[in-house]
Amino acid sequence: MILQSNSIAQQIADEGGVEAYLHAQQHKTMLRFLTCGSVDDGKSTLIGRLLHDTRQIYEDQLSTLHTDSKRIGTQGEKLDLALLVDGLQAEREQGITIDVAYRYFSTEKRKFIIADTPGHEQYTRNMATGASTCDLAILLIDARKGVLDQTRRHSFIATLLGIRHLVVAVNKMDLVGFQESVFTQFKDDYLSFAEQLPTDLDIKFVPLSALDGDNVASPSEKMDWYSGPTLLEILESVDVVNARRQQPLRFPVQYVNRPNLDFRGYAGTLSAGVVWVGQKVKVLPSGVESTVARIVTFDGDLTEANPGEAITLVLADEVDISRGDLLVDASETLKAARNALVDVVWMAEQPLVVGQSYDIKVAGKKTRARVENIQYQVEINSLTQRVVENLPLNGIGLVELAFDEPLLLDNYQRNRDTGGMIFIDRLSNVTVGAGLVREALASVYQENHDFSTFELELNALVRRHFPHWGARDLLGGK
């Protein structure tokens, strides 16, 4: 284990120095995944095992781990690998995970960002936060307990939040004698439940022991009846080809960069599609068109940018653009929605009620929304729907919202950035919920050939800088 603790330094040496090592890391594909399941299924231990077996632990960390394992560990004489991840003092002393803990590690094939999410029901909102940026979910099942309510809850939330790759890991197989029948039974149980989930899921199953490392990074000699890949092999090989490249261009403007009179750029992260120099783009909601003149980054100009890249676009024309505006391909006609049906994960003690107004943020755009009605709340255990008057803490339901101004929205399953929103309490400024757009309602087309480009720009300018004039949006907004 001491040898493993020096492995990162050894990897740097093998690559020929720090710069060569960093260059190799930059060109690896990235997989974001989370671990979730019921209470004490071994999520933090599994992450600790992955870090340990992929040689991501430094000597001082290992020394501290030995000391802490003896003082507050839960595994007797063995290393308590969960302590590598459970950072909060309350977590370490209780042996549970409360907050979402993020960790980074890499192998020769891929880079990973892990979100260790809490298993307790009262922290389901934390799990939803962790799942919102992930491509794959590891659902841990305790081999002594089987598929539990929280496992079903997390499966539903993960798929609701757009995750299509699920790995069902039956953990603690050492406590049931590594019996194949136990693994097979829980696999059948989960597949029976999964019939209620979306049909386009990629579900894989693996039996393992996170504490001892069986089938985590190396095959288990104690489960020779299992001929499938190890967990790490699944993580390294799962197909996460970024389908966002094939999607329509979406570039939400986060910041207008104007350091001097000679430069005006629009900074943000490319959400979907590909943008290139010379491409014709349209600015929404104004509808003004222009051409991409430059794609600026910290490392120099690009000729083309891909989804996920933080860039600054310079347009060929002087156009009035502000934070919250959206750049799309000039050939596209995108609708702005006055109302929308939104799947809501509620995160506040105070329930969501009909008639209440909240501030919301969508892709950098901030406005106000009113709850028109709650169509139903999902009963997580059975995935049935029931009529409710309010949506409580950790509740998930379908809600109709009415916006103060038309918003440019996509279905969340199509685009997380332009289809996802957060609810903010207007008094405390606390985030109280997450919304996932299912359907835009009462839309108006942004194309309107009755007005010239000058008229549209002037109208947008007046509404932005002279709101007390009460000017109406020429495209149908307020």
UniProtKB/Swiss-Prot annotation:
Keywords: ATP-binding, GTP-binding, Nucleotide-binding, Nucleotidyltransferase, Transferase. Residues 37-44 are annotated as: G1. CDD domains: CysN_ATPS (cd04166), CysN_NodQ_II (cd03695), CysN_NoDQ_III (cd04095). The keyword Heme does not apply. GTP binds at residues 37-44, 116-120, 171-174. InterPro entries: CysN_GTP-bd, CysN_II, CysN_NoDQ_III, G_TR_CS, GTP-eEF1A_C, P-loop_NTPase, Small_GTP-bd, SO4_adenylTrfase_lsu. Pfam families: GTP-eEF1A_C, GTP_EFTU. Residues 171-174 are annotated as: G4. Residues 95-99 are annotated as: G2. Pathway: Sulfur metabolism; hydrogen sulfide biosynthesis; sulfite from sulfate: step 1/3. Its EC number is 2.7.7.4. It comes from the Bacteria. GO terms for molecular function: ATP binding; GTP binding; GTPase activity; sulfate adenylyltransferase (ATP) activity. It catalyses: sulfate + ATP + H(+) = adenosine 5'-phosphosulfate + diphosphate. Residues 28-244 form the tr-type G domain. It is an enzyme of class 2 (transferase). GO terms for biological process: hydrogen sulfide biosynthetic process; sulfate assimilation; sulfur compound metabolic process. Residues 209-211 are annotated as: G5. Residues 116-119 are annotated as: G3. SUPFAM superfamilies: EF-Tu/eEF-1alpha/eIF2-gamma C-terminal domain (SSF50465), P-loop containing nucleoside triphosphate hydrolases (SSF52540), Translation proteins (SSF50447). Belongs to the TRAFAC class translation factor GTPase superfamily. Classic translation factor GTPase family. CysN/NodQ subfamily. Heterodimer composed of CysD, the smaller subunit, and CysN. PANTHER family: TRANSLATION FACTOR. With CysD forms the ATP sulfurylase (ATPS) that catalyzes the adenylation of sulfate producing adenosine 5'-phosphosulfate (APS) and diphosphate, the first enzymatic step in sulfur assimilation pathway. APS synthesis involves the formation of a high-energy phosphoric-sulfuric acid anhydride bond driven by GTP hydrolysis by CysN coupled to ATP hydrolysis by CysD. This is Sulfate adenylyltransferase subunit 1. It comes from Yersinia pestis. The gene is cysN.
